[in-house]
A protein has these predicted regions:
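A positively charged, amphipathic N-terminal helix/segment that binds anionic biomolecules
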Residues: 1-115
Length: 115
């Protein structure tokens, strides 16, 4: 009788381990998909910062291939505000992406331990 109970107990542990493993694998796939989505969203948004020069002329300052570029935005507050919103959105996406990458490392460590 004790052997049967022990066998059932071990079987329950195996089932739990398999369930945990499948949940973690699904989370890894979801995490990878979200990383790809955030990377594509970040690629569409402008990078850099807004600078104001003499007489209220605004420029978008960014680096590309190690070189510093200034792209003229204009004097209009609407254009400047729109680009500021896009820059803030990009910053948010970059923060989310770094959190997802940290989470991905944890998931891979967990999968290695479960294997």
């Amino acid at each position: 009788m004790v052997d049967i109970l022990r066998l059932v107990w071990y079987h329950q542990l195996e089932v739990r381990a398999m369930l945990i493993n499948s949940v973690v694998q699904r989370e890894a796939v979801r995490n990878e998909q979200m990383i790809l989505q955030y990377e594509s969203l970040i690629g569409e948004l402008p990078k850099g910062s807004i600078t104001c020069r003499k007489n209220g002329y605004y420029y978008l300052r960014y680096r590309e291939d190690g070189k510093l570029y200034d792209r003229y935005i204009g004097k209009g507050a609407e254009k400047v505000d729109a680009i500021r919103e896009k820059l803030a959105l990009r910053k948010h996406y970059v923060e989310m992406l770094s959190a997802l990458k940290r989470e991905q490392k944890t998931i891979h460590r967990l999968l290695e331990e479960l294997a």
